[in-house]
């Protein structure tokens, strides 16, 4: 493994550790963004399982959205993942933006999830 990859791996581990410390047992809302779609899932790290998930590929959203890669799609995914998390009994989460800046689609997803009842 090259030095660059080792440094990236160390940084990822450090970020995951910091999120686990701040979580205090709360599930985390993890975001993945690709060029065409956006995905969000609520993960319980203690149990190692996904409690709720949503993406711009979901059938209901896909037909209603023009594209899966804009702020409107991110907001719709945020609202949907918040509704599914509340159905699973989760109201408090820790936001895990990964390496993405809190800007644009990631911010739109987070704000929509907050407005729909998730607390973070």
Curated annotation (Swiss-Prot):
UniProt record, GO biological process: translation
GO MF term list: 5S rRNA binding; structural constituent of ribosome
Keyword Cytoplasm in annotation: no
Gene Ontology CC terms, in alphabetical order: cytosolic large ribosomal subunit
Pfam families recorded: Ribosomal_L18p
InterPro entries named in the record: Ribosomal_uL18_bac-type (IPR004389), Ribosomal_uL18_bac/euk (IPR005484)
Alphabetized UniProt keyword annotations: Ribonucleoprotein, Ribosomal protein, RNA-binding, rRNA-binding
Subunit structure: Part of the 50S ribosomal subunit; part of the 5S rRNA/L5/L18/L25 subcomplex. Contacts the 5S and 23S rRNAs.
HAMAP family: Ribosomal_uL18_B
Protein purpose: This is one of the proteins that bind and probably mediate the attachment of the 5S RNA into the large ribosomal subunit, where it forms part of the central protuberance.
Record-stated family: Belongs to the universal ribosomal protein uL18 family.
Protein name per UniProt: Large ribosomal subunit protein uL18
């Amino acid at each position: 493994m090259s030095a660059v990859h080792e440094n990236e791996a160390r940084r990822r581990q450090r970020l995951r550790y910091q999120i686990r410390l701040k979580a205090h047992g709360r599930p985390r809302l993890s975001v993945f963004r690709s060029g065409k779609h956006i995905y969000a899932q609520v993960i319980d790290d203690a149990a190692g399982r996904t409690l709720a998930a949503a993406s711009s590929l979901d059938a209901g959203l896909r037909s209603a959205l023009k594209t899966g890669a804009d702020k409107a799609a991110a907001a719709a995914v945020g609202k949907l993942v918040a509704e599914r998390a509340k159905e699973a009994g989760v109201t408090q989460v820790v936001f895990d933006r990964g390496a993405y800046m809190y800007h644009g689609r990631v911010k739109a997803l987070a704000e929509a999830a907050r407005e729909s009842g998730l607390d973070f």
